Amino acid sequence: MEIQWYPGHMAKAKRLLQSQLSKVDLVIELCDARLPLSSRNPALNELVRHKRRILLLCKADLAENGKTQEWLAYFKSRGVDAMAYDATPARTKQGKAFIATAAQSVVERGERRGMNKTVRAMVIGVPNVGKSTFINRLYGGSVTETGDRPGVTKSNRWVKVTPYLEVLDTPGMLWPKLNDQRAATRLAYIGTIRDAVYNQEELCVSLLEDLMTLRPTETMQRYKIKNADAKGYELLEEVCRGRGFLMRGGVLDMDRACSVVLDEFRAGKVGKLTLETAPKEEKPHAPETV
């Protein structure tokens, strides 16, 4: 199964994003804490590399705390200012302070000129990483449309979230060619890629195999899997029988099983799980930001 997804609105959004860069003081990049490396768009990274940037590891409540700390240390070693974030009030307060610190130099520059500078920040990231939810939390209400699916935001939009901070909500963007298919599969696990793009049964089988490697006890208990040695489609059949996903005549309801497994994983019901391990840095790396 090969996964590729780069619809026309993403290419258009990238061009619009480029046209807005000159107006931006700060870039706020969001990635998924469960996939801190694979959920960062290398094309966007190149596009904004000359801008002051901070990184938020979103949905941190769904990731393993210890591994999130390892990722934060890794990004720090690369000169990236990063913090773990989720949509709770406490984290939102920390996020506001984090942005304020990053924007301080812009504010001070305006004060030296006798101006009350409004900081303009661009929010970027892959689809369904939580950009619109993040902006709504900053604003303190529903100012942008959200949804638990990729592709909700289709155009760039400036939103004034405080008297001194204006943010640009941008559509989630992938890159034209997903060469690393292992990463593409994991992006599909977390809902970055539209469901219609891939074979749901193949994706679910792959996820179940990963869960049996990473969380065998929890996975077997949740889905009532009796055969610990089951592989491939045998796992999906075990889920159907264990959870009672049967149609008339005892036919296994594979579609329902796939939907449930994917939905429950994305909601964190199998437990906190980080799908990537932070690389070990042997020597200091050149900073990503300027």
Model-inferred region functions:
Residues V106-G114, N136, S142-D148, L214-T219:
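Short, structured loop/turn "capping" segments at alpha-beta junctions
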Residues L44-E46, L72, Y139:
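Short, solvent-exposed amphipathic alpha-helical segments in soluble enzyme
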Residues M1-V27, A33-R53, A60, G66, ...:
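Helix-rich effector regions associated with P-loop NTPase G domains
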Residues R52-I54, D61-G125, V143, F245:
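Canonical P-loop GTPase G-domain recognition
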Residues A121-G140, T144, T170:
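Glycine-rich phosphate-binding P-loop
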